[in-house]
UniProtKB/Swiss-Prot annotation:
Family membership noted in the UniProt record: Belongs to the aldehyde dehydrogenase family.
Catalytic class of the enzyme: oxidoreductase
Pfam family, one: Aldedh
Keywords: NAD, Oxidoreductase
Classification via PANTHER family: ALDEHYDE DEHYDROGENASE, ALDEHYDE DEHYDROGENASE-RELATED
GO-annotated biological processes: aldehyde metabolic process
Source species of the chain: Staphylococcus aureus (strain MSSA476)
Entry protein name: Putative aldehyde dehydrogenase
Molecular function as annotated in GO: aldehyde dehydrogenase (NAD+) activity
C-alpha cells in the first residue's frame, strides 16, 4: 500500500491543508493500492507562492545551468526506472513491457529532448539595431491526464524547466504515483526550492483554484475537451496563456497498393495500444472498397492474436481500462454502435472470457460504419475500431477530415507521391507515414477541437516563454 498523503511544496514534503485523501485503485484487480492527499485551495496558494517567489531567480539562470539541471534529472530518472515501471503498471494497469518500452521511455525522451534542444535554441535575436528576447513566462500550472502518467507530465516539466519557468503540477488523481516519483527525483538532484511543486487532489479542489490563481501566468492542460474548455474559461478572467492538448478521433487511411498484412498489423496496434486509451489512436480505419474483404480477413487474424490479461504476466499486450466509469463508457459506445446499425465484426460488449475481475474490455471491430455514427465521431478511449470504406482518394480525405478533431492522422501504402498528398491533406497536427513514429523533438498538438499550442522539443519550450522586443538596443 502506497501512502503519498503529503504534498511537495517549496522543496519539502509537507502535510496537506486538507485531511481528506483519495484512494488509488489498481484497475486489473479493482483493489485499493494506495492513497494521496485530496488537496485544496490553501495547498494551491502555498505552492503558487513558492513558485512565484523563485520565479525571477530561476528565470535568470543561464542556459547551461538549466541544461545541467535537466542532465541530472535524466540520470536520476534512469536510476529510478524499475520504480517508475512498477508504479505505472500498478496504477494504470499497463502491461509491464508497455510500462517499460513506452511509458518509462517516453518520459525519459522528453527530458533528453528538452536538454538537447537548448544546445541551439536562441533566446535572443538581433534585428538591426533592435533586440528580440524570449523570457520565461512565469508561474505555470500543469494539469496532466491518467493515460500517460510519465509522458504527459515529463514533456510539460522538461519544457518549463528548459524555459526557466517554475511550475505547480496537478497530476491525475487516478494515476498519481509516477508524479510522486518524479518529485522524489527532482528533490534528489536539487531542483531549486519552489521551481517544482506537486499538489495532489481532484479538479474541484486543486485544478480550479490553480486555473484561477492570479499569480499563475500560464496553464498547460492535457485531457478532455469539456475540461479544457472550463480551464480556458477560468484562465480568461486574467488573460492567462493557455496550452491545451485535447481529444482526437484520428483517421488511418489504408491505400490500395498496401501490403495488407502490414496494414492490418499497423492499424491493430494503433487501436489496442495502451488499451485504446490514447488521444492519437487511429480508431477510424479507412479502407478502399476493392481490398476490403482481404483486409478484414487479415485484420481479424491480427485481433485474434492480441492477448488481453494480467498486466504482470509475460505475453500480455493489453491491460484493463483505467476505471469502472471508463469501462462503462466504452461499453456504452459499443452498444451505441450496434444500435446505430454498425456491423459487429469482432469482439463486442462485456469482458474477455476468464477476466471477470478487473476492468478488462474486449478489443472490438465495427465494419460498415458510416462516418456520421456516434462511434465514428466521438472519442471512445477504449480498444474499439471503426472500419469505413471509400471509393477513391478524394473521398478518403473528405471522410478523414469530417470530424471536429484534428490531433493526428495516419496513412500507409507504397506510392510516395500518394502518401505525401494524403499526409498534406489530413487536417491534423501530426501525421505519420508508414508507421514512422513521432520523435520527441517534433511539435505535437492539434487542429480544431484537439487543442491549442504545441508541445515537445523546442516548440514545447516556446509555450513557456514570452517575447519582448527592445528597440534601439544596439544604437
Amino acid at each position: 500500500m502506497r501512502d503519498y498523503t503529503k504534498q511537495y511544496i517549496n522543496g519539502e514534503w509537507v502535510e496537506s491543508n486538507s485531511n481528506e485523501t483519495i484512494e488509488v485503485i489498481n484497475p486489473a484487480t479493482e483493489e485499493v493500492i494506495g492513497k494521496v492527499a485530496k488537496g485544496n485551495k490553501a495547498d494551491v496558494d502555498k505552492a503558487v507562492e513558492a513558485a512565484d517567489n523563485v520565479y525571477l531567480e530561476f528565470r535568470h539562470t543561464s542556459v547551461k545551468e538549466r541544461q545541467a539541471l535537466l542532465d541530472k534529472i535524466v540520470k536520476e530518472y534512469e536510476n529510478r526506472k524499475d520504480d517508475i515501471v512498477q508504479a505505472i503498471t500498478d496504477e494504470l494497469g499497463a502491461p509491464l513491457s508497455l510500462s517499460e518500452r513506452v511509458h518509462y521511455q517516453m518520459g525519459l525522451n522528453h527530458f533528453v529532448a528538452a536538454r538537447d534542444a537548448l544546445d541551439n535554441y536562441e533566446f535572443e535575436e538581433r534585428r538591426g539595431d533592435d533586440l528580440v528576447v524570449k523570457e520565461a513566462i512565469g508561474v505555470s500550472g500543469l494539469i496532466t491526464p491518467w493515460n500517460f502518467p510519465t509522458n504527459q507530465t515529463s514533456l510539460k516539466l522538461a519544457a518549463a524547466f528548459a524555459a526557466g519557468s517554475p511550475v505547480v503540477l496537478k497530476p491525475s488523481e487516478e494515476t498519481p504515483f509516477a508524479a510522486v516519483i518524479l518529485a522524489e527525483i527532482f528533490d534528489k538532484v536539487g531542483v531549486p526550492k519552489g521551481v517544482f511543486n506537486l499538489v495532489n487532489g481532484d479538479g474541484a479542489g486543486v485544478g480550479n483554484p490553480l486555473s484561477e490563481h492570479p499569480k499563475v501566468r500560464m496553464m498547460s492542460f492535457t485531457g478532455s475537451g469539456p475540461t479544457g474548455s472550463k480551464i480556458m474559461e477560468k484562465a480568461a478572467k486574467d488573460f492567462k496563456k493557455v496550452s491545451l492538448e485535447l481529444g482526437g478521433k484520428s483517421p488511418y487511411i489504408v491505400l490500395d497498393d498496401v501490403d495488407i498484412k502490414e496494414a492490418a498489423k499497423a492499424t491493430t496496434g494503433k487501436v489496442v495500444n495502451n488499451t485504446g486509451q490514447v488521444c492519437t489512436a487511429g480508431t477510424r480505419v479507412l479502407v478502399p472498397k476493392k481490398i476490403k474483404d482481404a483486409f478484414l480477413a487479415e485484420l481479424k487474424e491480427q485481433f485474434s492474436q492480441v492477448r488481453v490479461g494480467n498486466p504482470r504476466e509475460d505475453g500480455t499486450q493489453v491491460g484493463p481500462i483505467i476505471s469502472k466509469k471508463q469501462f462503462d463508457q466504452v461499453q456504452n459506445y459499443i452498444n451505441k454502435g450496434i444500435e446505430e446499425g454498425a456491423e459487429l465484426f469482432y469482439g463486442g460488449p462485456g469482458k474477455p472470457e476468464g477476466l471477470e475481475k478487473g476492468y478488462f474490455a474486449r478489443p472490438t471491430i465495427f465494419i460498415n460504419v458510416d462516418n456520421q455514427m456516434t462511434i465514428a465521431q466521438e472519442e471512445i478511449f477504449g480498444p474499439v475500431m471503426s472500419v469505413i470504406t471509400y471509393n477513391d482518394l478524394d473521398e478518403a480525405i473528405q471522410i478523414a477530415n469530417d470530424t471536429k478533431y484534428g490531433l493526428a492522422g495516419y496513412v500507409i501504402g507504397k506510392d510516395k507521391e500518394t502518401l505525401h498528398k494524403v499526409a498534406r491533406s489530413i487536417e491534423a497536427g501530426t501525421v505519420e507515414i508508414n508507421e514512422a513514429g513521432r520523435k520527441p523533438d517534433l511539435p505535437f498538438g492539434g487542429y480544431k477541437q484537439s487543442g491549442l499550442g504545441r508541445e515537445w522539443g523546442d516548440y514545447g519550450i516556446e509555450e513557456f516563454l514570452e517575447v519582448k522586443s527592445i528597440a534601439g538596443y544596439f544604437k
